[in-house]
Amino acid sequence: MEILLIFLLALVIDMVFGDPPNAFHPVAYMGKVISLFERAGFKGGKGYQFVYGIVMVIFTMALFFVPVYFLLDWLQGINSIVYIIVSAILFKMCFTVTGLRKAALLIKRLLEKDDIAQARFELRSLVSRDTSKLPQPKLVAAAVESVAESIGDGFVAPLFFFLIFGVPGVMAYRVVSTFDSMVGYRGKYEYLGKFAARFDDVLNFIPARLSALCILVASFFGRYSPAGAWRIMWRDHGKTQSPNAGWPMATAAGALEVCLEKVGHYSLGDDIRPLLPQTISCSLVLINNAGCIWVLISVGVIYFARIA
């Protein structure tokens, strides 16, 4: 029963309060630790950087996993209510729904006002690509891509690892995800971030595909195309550089009947409907419904695991 209460309370906290300020957010501190360790990672050659990257990931995972594990174990033995509340707060900090929704809706409102310059600026908080010259359709596409991809690593994956490993496990997952977002790139971080990038790919392998299935089911509710979601999911999921990101993005593109293109990298879906500011709202409804489906599945897993 405790795990179900933690799960549901964390969702309520997200809906009511959203994301906490960076001063209280563990992901912000993960980023600071990574930046601190990163400086010493370039002192040697390729082999040194690769090994250093492995040690850096494992050490940082332990740095957040171990204190959280013992803190919650101690609280559980003292007061179950305090244990549930603290666990829910920590768990909520490992996933995001409300914050992304607000950011996407802000971009939609700016585009509706034809404030392209400000929309480009705000979009930088959602994507890593250069937004300075993107026209409106590409801005919409980038926002929709971010919304679709986020359900995988931002919601389904944290809940998935919570069900298996509890709050400490989600913290460890979030460390790897943060590493990947900061150093999991080619070029400068080719060897330093290689382990983090591959580890993140492995951890998100199942959640990414589960998120695509949730989007597919959600496409049956509303003015979406389930047939398109199914077809594009299988046709285009492998077009992205990431082995995981393409699954939810391609499925969403098919359901929305739009083409999501990152110029020079990939093109997902067919250009059946135009990319309009309203498309962002449609994508949010689709992804929210997919998230609700995953919540129902998770609650079912918790319930049947309890009575088994």
From Swiss-Prot:
One of its GO terms (molecular function) is threonine-phosphate decarboxylase activity. Pfam families: CobD_Cbib. It is a multi-pass membrane protein. The keyword Membrane applies. One of its GO terms (cellular component) is plasma membrane. It comes from the Bacteria. The chain crosses the membrane at residues 1-21, 50-70, 71-91, 151-171, 202-222, 284-304. It is found in: Cell membrane. Pathway: Cofactor biosynthesis; adenosylcobalamin biosynthesis. InterPro entries: Cobalamin_biosynth_CobD/CbiB. Its main location: membrane. Coiled coil: none annotated. The keyword Transmembrane applies. GO terms for biological process: cobalamin biosynthetic process. Keywords: Cell membrane, Cobalamin biosynthesis, Membrane, Transmembrane, Transmembrane helix. Belongs to the CobD/CbiB family. HAMAP family: CobD_CbiB. NCBIfam families: cobal_cbiB (TIGR00380), PRK01209.2-5 (NF002281). This is Cobalamin biosynthesis protein CobD. It comes from Dehalococcoides mccartyi (strain CBDB1).
